[in-house]
UniProtKB/Swiss-Prot annotation:
Keyword Nucleotidyltransferase: no
Designated name of the protein: Argininosuccinate synthase
Residues reported in the UniProt entry to bind ATP: 8-16, 117
Main location: cytoplasm
Length: 400
């Protein structure tokens, strides 16, 4: 088996240190794989050069923005995926895509080992390693941060001692993960639950308490559950996310301060920014309310929750998730139409819906003249619907 190590490289502290550490401590060559998921910030050529400067024998940059949007974010939209009803899976969605490209790189560069920079406390170690086990069980996995108990202080010290070009200090110890779907910030003073986030924590969104901005009204169009237009203009899924990130972010939409239950059994505090994601999920959910039959909608809400839990728990490649997506695909056949939303002050307000597939019948719903609902049928329906409750109540109350 080859001694080459294929490393998931972010350009950040832990993976930059990992390149140098693997070379120095094990003598193995490192191929760094950096994936553009629309995270912005540094130019990917700069990230690639940093990997080489840290000691990688090769550094590969992959533009996966459209793939991420179409194959990972879109299923999350269609499953209205919010872990614990709040978190739109910002990091969790990206991990299986990274796994896929690392496995491909291992085959191409004849590497027998794949590596990541995850700690032993987080969910990402599970997402990576279960993914590797699902796609390439023959590959060995190296996790230096976890297996050698690196702390951020130790990593910073190693970076300083070895002149690793990374801009992190003990005074600004935030751990940040971001992509086009959103941004996650943790560690530092945020680990104390009573501490309020400071302005420097945020980047994708403006302060929602500043009400100087004019409300932004946006119309999002869907075709079979796929976002296809904004204000009547055709867009790809990636373009929809990017535009709504800008517009909703300018209105302070998408800030989330969450204490979540990690897969490893601990609770953690995370600050998320996901303006585009929250708008798209809100709009899609609302369109489903209009177009899905009641029992289908009720059941889908249970599968939506399960889908999100599976992705959060690192089971992207599981048979159950695959089966759930077949069900979700069937539910989307009539999820077409437009949702109008107002973005302002950190809030999303739906104020309009229209669809050729709508199950809303005005003549049945109206209380005004033109009502076609046969109210005479209601009395019998109510009696039959409550019959079992009535029978049990008579027994329990001793009424014959």
């Amino acid at each position: 088996m080859s001694e080459r190590v294929i490393l998931a490289y972010s350009g950040g502290l832990d993976t930059s240190v990992a390149i140098s550490w693997i070379g120095k401590e094990t003598g193995r060559e490192v191929v760094a794989v950096a994936i553009d998921l629309g995270q912005g910030g540094e130019d990917m050529d700069v990230v690639r050069q940093r990997a080489l400067d840290c000691g990688a024998v090769e550094a590969v940059v992959i533009d996966a923005r459209d793939e991420f949007a179409e194959d990972y974010c879109l299923p999350a939209i269609q499953s209205n995926a919010l872990y614990m009803d709040r978190y739109p899976l910002v990091s969790a969605l990206s991990r299986p895509l990274i796994v896929k490209h690392l496995v491909d790189a291992a085959r191409e560069h004849k590497g027998g080992i794949v590596a990541h920079g995850c700690t032993g406390k987080g969910n990402d170690q599970v997402r990576f390693e279960v993914g590797f086990a699902s796609l390439a069980p023959d590959l060995e996995v190296l996790a230096p941060v976890r297996d050698y108990a690196w702390t951020r202080e130790k990593a910073i010290a190693f970076a300083e001692e070895n002149a690793i070009p990374i801009n992190v200090t003990k005074r600004s110890p935030f751990s940040i993960d971001q992509n086009v779907w959103g941004r996650a910030v943790e560690t530092g003073f945020l680990e104390h639950l009573w501490n309020a986030p400071t302005k420097d924590v945020y980047d994708y969104t403006e302060d929602p308490t500043l009400n100087w901005s004019t409300p932004d009204e946006v119309i999002v169009g869907f075709d079979k559950g796929v976002p296809v237009s904004i204000d009547g203009r055709d867009v790809t899924v990636l373009q929809a996310i990017e535009e709504l990130n800008r517009r909703a972010g300018a209105q302070g939409v998408g800030r989330l301060d969450v204490v979540e239950d990690r897969l490893v059994g601990i609770k953690s505090r995370e600050i998320y920014e996901a303006p585009g994601a929250m708008v798209l999920i809100t709009a899609h959910t609302e369109l489903e309310h209009v177009t899905l039959e009641r029992e289908l909608g009720r059941f889908k809400r249970t599968t939506d929750q399960k889908w999100g839990e599976l992705v959060y728990d690192g089971l992207w490649f599981s048979p159950l998730k695959t089966a759930l997506e077949s069900f979700v695909a069937k539910t989307q056949e009539h999820v077409s139409g437009e949702i109008r939303l107002v973005l302002h002050g950190g809030h999303i307000a739906v104020n309009g819906r229209r669809s050729q597939e709508s199950l809303y019948d005005f003549n049945l719903a109206t209380y005004d003249e033109g009502d076609t609902f046969d109210q005479s049928s209601a009395k019998g329906f109510v009696h039959v619907h409550g019959l079992s409750s009535s029978i049990s109540a008579r027994r329990d109350l001793g009424i014959k």
